């Protein structure tokens, strides 16, 4: 199980780097104008990019295990790793956010979600802990799947 979660962690962190790199590019293209300054085409592409990111996380969670319980726990676990890593990479690459109270656009689907950076970090930490606990409290058939996945 540890090897599999390590691989999933690395995947989620790598996805976060890709996402943060996109933000670096967008900020270079649209400096100090905010997200509302982007063209309708760029906005639509961003919505599709977000949807594609979620689909990639879902696909990896689906491929990682056989049972629905493990797939759901895995999706939330890698989502949390991805989300926290995204902000870590933004801080390393851009020195942003200036503080945990800095406002950000979290998602564009179905509508823009805006709030302080601390909010997704706290929620992701809670989701990470809940998913980690779920991994340790599996029914016997799921424990067997996890044990066989480690081999």
Tell what function each PLM region has.
Residues 1-12, 66-81, 144-149:
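Interfacial segments of alpha-helical transmembrane regions
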Residues 56-64, 89-96:
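Membrane-helix exit/interface motif
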Residues 12, 16, 57-60, 80-87, ...:
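Helical transmembrane-bundle signal
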Residues 37-59, 108-129:
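Membrane-interface loop-to-helix entry segments
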Residues 25-32, 88-107:
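Interfacial helix-loop-helix junctions of multi-pass membrane proteins
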Residues 74-94:
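Active-site beta-strand/loop microenvironment that shapes enzyme catalytic pockets
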Residues 61-68, 129-139:
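Structural signal for the C-terminal ends of transmembrane alpha-helices
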Residues 13-28:
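Alpha-helical transmembrane segments of multi-pass membrane proteins
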């Amino acid at each position: 199980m540890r090897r599999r979660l390590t691989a999933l962690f690395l995947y989620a962190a790598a996805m976060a780097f890709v996402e943060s790199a996109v933000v670096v590019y967008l900020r270079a293209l649209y400096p100090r104008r905010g997200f509302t300054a982007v063209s309708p085409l760029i906005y639509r592409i961003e919505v599709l990019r977000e949807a594609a990111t979620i689909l990639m996380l879902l696909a990896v969670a689906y491929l990682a295990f056989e049972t629905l319980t493990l797939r759901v726990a895995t999706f939330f676990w890698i989502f949390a790793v991805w989300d926290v890593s995204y902000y870590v990479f933004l801080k390393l690459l851009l020195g942003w956010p200036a503080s945990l109270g800095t406002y950000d656009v979290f998602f564009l689907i179905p509508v823009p979600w805006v709030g302080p950076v601390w909010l997704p970090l706290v929620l992701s930490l809670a989701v990470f802990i809940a998913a980690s606990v779920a991994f340790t409290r599996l029914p016997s058939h799921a424990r067997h799947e996890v044990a066989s996945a480690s081999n």
